[in-house]
Amino acid sequence: MNLGTLVSETRNPQTMDLDALSTPELVKRFNEQDTRVAEAVKATLPDVARAVDAAAAALKSGGRIIYMGAGTSGRLGVLDASECPPTFGVPHGLVVGLIAGGPGALLKAVEGAEDSQQAGEDDLVALNLQEQDLVVGLAASGRTPYVIGGLRYARQSGCTTVAVSCNPDSPIAREANIAISPVVGPEALTGSTRLKSGTAQKMVLNMISTGAMVKFGKVYQNLMVDMKATNVKLVDRACRMVVEATGIGREEAETLLKQTDFEVKPAILMALTGLDAAAAREKLAAHQGFLRAALEH
């Protein structure tokens, strides 16, 4: 592949004079480019919705969401995966981020790590990949060998696969069941895909993980009701969620949360139904953890 022909590698005619601009002009030019990212992502929403449903289906069948990428793309996957346990109360390992070159590549580039298809396969083998898992390959260029190797192995293993790239009709898109390709255009700094391409990928990952968790029963209304209250700020947030979801006072909310070890869902159910903590947990379990269903049935 001639990398110079990729949209993400071409020069942007609107930013050819970066080194001659004043600082206010420079940041304005970057901001003007960034405004195009949301529109590019908007054009991919039907495919993002398919990926959300596939991610939710993986979780409901006992599988995992596995992100894999190199460089910026890999770091974004690791970032999104690492936020899921504290935000949604899921176990570490339910959402996984793989980066070419291993954990050390998060802080320091590992040269050449992305160039091996076998490394992508090997990293999935090391995770004991199962057919219930969803594998999401991330590559702004759409041609990273590490990601291609991983997606190919995942499909051969019976997994549903998703490709996220910022170039149209990319090689990783051809390896995946679902292709999400927000074409953000040439970067303000030629080839620096940590810019618009990275922003677009982050927006897509936000929707995939959050959407999947909504459909996995981790959200009530727009509240993260399975959040783990592990510090002072989060204990306060747990109290506010119970107050906002039920209309009870702060003191009563704190009393209920102490009875549930600061688990928000059973505290809300107790406030709205009069159940005790054990009965609230039992009812939630009967409805697979979906608070709305437990309240309505």
UniProtKB/Swiss-Prot annotation:
HAMAP family xrefs: MurQ (MF_00068)
Pathway it works in: Amino-sugar metabolism; 1,6-anhydro-N-acetylmuramate degradation; Amino-sugar metabolism; N-acetylmuramate degradation; Cell wall biogenesis; peptidoglycan recycling
Molecular function per GO: carbohydrate derivative binding; carbon-oxygen lyase activity; ether hydrolase activity
Keywords: Carbohydrate metabolism, Lyase
Sequence similarity: Belongs to the GCKR-like family. MurNAc-6-P etherase subfamily.
GO biological process, one term: peptidoglycan turnover
Further facts: A lyase-type mechanism (elimination/hydration) is suggested for the cleavage of the lactyl ether bond of MurNAc 6-phosphate, with the formation of an alpha,beta-unsaturated aldehyde intermediate with (E)-stereochemistry, followed by the syn addition of water to give product.
InterPro entries from the UniProt entry: Etherase_MurQ, Glucokinase_regulatory_CS, MURQ/GCKR, SIS_dom, SIS_dom_sf
Catalyzed reaction equations: N-acetyl-D-muramate 6-phosphate + H2O = N-acetyl-D-glucosamine 6-phosphate + (R)-lactate
NCBIfam families: N-acetylmuramic acid 6-phosphate etherase (TIGR00274), PRK05441.1 (NF003915), PRK12570.1 (NF009222)
Source domain of life: Bacteria
EC number: 4.2.1.126
UniProt-recorded name of the protein: N-acetylmuramic acid 6-phosphate etherase
Keyword Amino-acid biosynthesis: no
Pfam hit, one: GKRP_SIS_N
Induction text: Induced by MurNAc 6-phosphate that releases the repressor MurR from the DNA. Repressed by MurR in the absence of MurNAc 6-phosphate.
Record function comment: Specifically catalyzes the cleavage of the D-lactyl ether substituent of MurNAc 6-phosphate, producing GlcNAc 6-phosphate and D-lactate. Together with AnmK, is also required for the utilization of anhydro-N-acetylmuramic acid (anhMurNAc) either imported from the medium or derived from its own cell wall murein, and thus plays a role in cell wall recycling.
Subunit structure, interactors included: Homodimer.
SIS domain: residues covered: 55-218
Alphabetical list of PANTHER family matching this protein: GLUCOKINASE REGULATORY PROTEIN (PTHR10088), N-ACETYLMURAMIC ACID 6-PHOSPHATE ETHERASE (PTHR10088:SF5)
Active site: 83 (proton donor), 114
Taxonomic source organism: Salmonella agona (strain SL483)
